[in-house]
Regions:
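Catalytic glycan-binding domains that act on GlcNAc-containing polysaccharides
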Residues: 1-30, 34-51, 82-285
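Alpha-helical segment of the N-proximal tetratricopeptide repeat
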Residues: 51-82, 94
């Protein structure tokens, strides 16, 4: 009964993310949908409802409303005088402005910090923050790849957000490249020939190969999202060594026992992203 109450409270106040998913699944309300996205979902996936900036600055809000994000960003920078954002409200505004000028890498980082620092009295910011945290960047590129590989678009978006924050040119210190952070050796195996860094940074090619690898992992683990996403990060060989007889009964325990801290966090982030992309989650204040 105590566990059920905890799940219910989580679902009301934190319906998005990994723990929102696990709460909904444990209560039998809804689960992560791993069915293929319907054909022709690209246009629908990119149609994120417009939201006012609500910065408290009438001129800035007007520029945003008129579809001039660059001018709005420059106005914000000028008025801030180089000062960093001081609280969740500032982080939300600046993060959204950065997104508006194509800087998802920094913008999403600021929005995540805003969510972490959010105070109870700022609860009214949650719907705006939740939407901004889950942009559907490159959906027109990911949707055909998802359709070809029979994957849900929400899962690919969840991986891309965590891997690259939707930044095609990003490269990791380990050598992974592009939107879905493919290792050159893995990409060459999937493509049947070596690819240059520039080729791997091309969104369509990266999306196609990344979706192909993600599908291979999903098939290998017979549709288990936890092992699939862990394998995408740590490799299927490592994940094979972490299997336990009761993993399907106690998936939350299995995740917490993942010996690689990076992979443990990665699994929660990616599947939490996918859950939030699957359907808009609105927390209750």
């Amino acid at each position: 009964e105590e566990a059920t109450l905890t799940w219910k409270q989580l679902l009301v106040h934190h319906p998005g993310g990994y723990y929102g998913w696990r709460a909904a699944a444990r209560l039998g309300k809804e689960d992560l949908n791993l069915q293929p996205s319907p054909a022709g979902t690209a246009e629908e996936a990119t149609s994120t409802p417009w939201q006012p900036l609500a910065s408290g600055d009438a001129a800035l809000d007007q520029l945003w409303r008129l579809g001039q994000p660059t001018e709005a960003w420059e106005t914000w920078r000028l008025r801030r005088g180089g000062l960093p954002p001081k609280d969740s409200g500032d982080l939300l505004v600046e993060g959204r402005l950065r997104q508006g000028v194509g800087d998802d890498w920094t913008g999403l980082g600021q929005l995540e910090k805003a969510a972490f620092l959010l105070k109870p009295e700022q609860c009214s910011l949650l719907p705006q923050l939740e939407q901004a945290l889950h942009p559907r960047r490159f959906a027109e590129t990911f949707a055909p790849a998802a359709e070809q590989q029979q994957l849900p678009l929400s899962l690919i978006l969840g991986v891309a957000k965590q891997e690259s924050r939707f930044t095609p040119a990003v490269q990791s210190s380990a050598g992974a490249v592009g939107l879905l952070q493919l290792m050159p050796a893995t990409a060459a195996e999937l493509a049947g020939n070596p690819l240059t860094t520039e080729e791997l940074q091309e969104p369509k090619r990266n999306a196609g190969l990344g979706a192909q690898y993600l599908k291979a992992m999903l098939d290998q683990w017979k549709g288990d999202p936890l092992a699939t996403v862990a394998s995408y990060n740590a490799g299927p060989g490592a994940v094979q060594g972490w299997q336990t007889p009761d993993r399907s009964r106690f998936p939350e325990v299995w995740v917490e026992a993942i010996p690689y801290p990076e992979t443990r966090i990665y699994v929660k982030k990616v599947l939490g992203n996918a859950w939030s992309y699957q359907q808009e989650r609105r927390p209750a204040c």
